[in-house]
Amino acid sequence: MKIGVSGIQGDFREHKVMLEKLGVDVKVVRKPEELDEVDGLVIPGGESTTMIRIMKMVNLYEKLKQKIKEGFPVFGTCAGMILLSKEVVNFPQDSLGVIDIKVERNAYGRQVDSFEEQIEVKGFEKTFNAIFIRAPKVVDYGENVEVLATYMDSPVLLRQNNVLVASFHPELTEDTRIHEYFLNMVKK
């Protein structure tokens, strides 16, 4: 199994390190043809409007959207969640629209308002230390979306078929369980 990490912008190196810690072959993806070399893709946190703009410039946007619709597994964290969402409610921007959620950008505050919180994740025996940095908030989601974790009654980890998204940054912890969850999605 080879997992891609979108290297367009953002904290892709941290995801790469986390996946390598799990013994996974990792490829940093920056071109559309590189999607054909991987079995799944992680889209990191960063600046979502910049990511979309660059993805379109290098012709990655449309190919990725099509592959996801065909069942290609993808995991988006923070800005990655925004990119994958159906709609961004507080800022006019494009998104891939591959998971039926509506998000509000930077809903948990600015960079200085970043925080950590122990959250319960469906299927995990112990809580997960979630790190929120200018995190998006899910304000609505469709009936086919599974909520795997919440913070203050708001969904922060969700899945719809082959798409997994998190408001927080699991790659900034030492806990590999959410990345392992994604790898299990890819294996199926």
UniProtKB/Swiss-Prot annotation:
Keywords linked to the UniProt accession: Glutamine amidotransferase, Hydrolase, Lyase, Pyridoxal phosphate
Active-site feature positions: 78, 169, 171
Residues bound to L-glutamine: 46-48, 105, 133-134
Keyword hit for Cell membrane: no
One GO term describing the cellular component: cytosol
Annotated catalysed reactions: aldehydo-D-ribose 5-phosphate + D-glyceraldehyde 3-phosphate + L-glutamine = pyridoxal 5'-phosphate + L-glutamate + phosphate + 3 H2O + H(+); L-glutamine + H2O = L-glutamate + NH4(+)
TM ranges: none
GO biological process, one term: pyridoxine metabolic process
Molecular-function annotations in GO: glutaminase activity; pyridoxal 5'-phosphate synthase (glutamine hydrolysing) activity
Quaternary structure and interacting proteins, as annotated: In the presence of PdxS, forms a dodecamer of heterodimers. Only shows activity in the heterodimer.
Family: Belongs to the glutaminase PdxT/SNO family.
HAMAP family attached to this UniProt entry: PdxT (MF_01615)
Function: Catalyzes the hydrolysis of glutamine to glutamate and ammonia as part of the biosynthesis of pyridoxal 5'-phosphate. The resulting ammonia molecule is channeled to the active site of PdxS.
Protein name: Pyridoxal 5'-phosphate synthase subunit PdxT
Native organism: Thermosipho africanus (strain TCF52B)
Lineage: Bacteria, Thermotogati, Thermotogota, Thermotogae, Thermotogales
